[in-house]
């Protein structure tokens, strides 16, 4: 089983065998040997050797290969979407949009590099001031399972454009998607060693994160793991660290004329991708009184009709399975803990089969829970909080250590102006789902949601460092000398 990609060749790992499973059927989706510490060392060494040649390539030459990658992704959209659906449980309709986003990332990343970094010149009296950007060197990219193609791609593409070389460690829950993606890079003509793939579980990740020859680490995943990485690199200022983590995101419902539109956007916010987006709404603030009652009744009615099915079902479901049977069980357990603390289930979550990742979209009223835990439950578990005043809703929405996304559904533009001034989050939407984001804008949050904006348009900032120069084409003695100098 040759499932590692090192120095331009597919090779076998020397670590333990592990497998990924289709969470909708429990069938094995991928199996192979993991990368040992020695394998990781070979991958980093390969990336280090390749760096000089890759970074010396003309920018347009690097971009030509990356554009070829995008074209091949489009050609292979169905095959890669199937790989994504098989390993993650994500319905095919949604997996196809992920592949399209991967291809679109290339053009956006080239534009971002030129705008955010690139080269700038300004004339001076005796020469020119030049700002250039240099690649860091070897960067490690850690990918998540919820978007195993798109999210690591969002770091790999800008890193390569800038001239870095990459060692990619995907989620152990989606190694097959990583393999399919790297095969496309190989066919696109990427030189040997520029991109290396190390498959594995926790030990592989530790070996890569601890390697002394990496110059940067780009991580997308849980806040707990990201916080550990932040502590680990706290004494190493020479490492560029990009952390894109989770959120306990609020969606505030104001009075609206079109209740069905509000319910639709709430369902998209809470349950899209089976709630496995870091920008999904976890806490939904609903006003007390008659309007709030009508909204909640309609939200419950539509949610109760949502079905979950296997990724390639016909007709396609709105939701697939969550990533694993274990993840499904953890969500049901989280609901139980909330109920023990005083939450009232409106639609209770159940796990369809203990071997599978199927859970239903659930709604629990946590208004009466004192000291509501500030936790991200990564799945379709919506927590309802009834509020008396708009300012009370904003105050409670801000009562979190996270700050990734937030949203307001309201007809009142003055309410929106007040909301965006006072809410604390990196992505703040009005009359759009909380998980609506543009790749042409920076992506990231405040607090425990990450460090600055490591994804989307501002990813370019993490992929190259500025080098300032003052230059003159001719060496000349100044016409005016400093006091005390005699020539």
From Swiss-Prot:
EC number: 1.2.1.71
A Pfam family the protein falls into: Aldedh
Catalytic residue list: 244, 278
InterPro entries cross-referenced by the UniProt entry: Ald_DH/histidinol_DH, Ald_DH_C, Ald_DH_CS_CYS, Ald_DH_CS_GLU, Ald_DH_N, Aldehyde_DH_dom, SuccinylGlu_semiald_DH_AstD
A GO molecular-function annotation: succinylglutamate-semialdehyde dehydrogenase activity
GO biological process: one example: arginine catabolic process to succinate
Claim: Ribosomal protein is one of the keywords in the record: no
Transmembrane region(s): none
The organism's place on the tree of life at top rank: Bacteria
Residue positions binding NAD(+): 221-226
Catalytic activity: N-succinyl-L-glutamate 5-semialdehyde + NAD(+) + H2O = N-succinyl-L-glutamate + NADH + 2 H(+)
Pathway where this protein functions: Amino-acid degradation; L-arginine degradation via AST pathway; L-glutamate and succinate from L-arginine: step 4/5
Keywords on record: Arginine metabolism, NAD, Oxidoreductase
Class of the enzyme per the UniProt entry, highest EC level: oxidoreductase
Function: Catalyzes the NAD-dependent reduction of succinylglutamate semialdehyde into succinylglutamate.
HAMAP family in the cross-refs: Aldedh_AstD (MF_01174)
Stated family: Belongs to the aldehyde dehydrogenase family. AstD subfamily.
Record-linked PANTHER family: ALDEHYDE DEHYDROGENASE-RELATED
Name of the protein in question: N-succinylglutamate 5-semialdehyde dehydrogenase
Organism: Burkholderia orbicola (strain MC0-3)
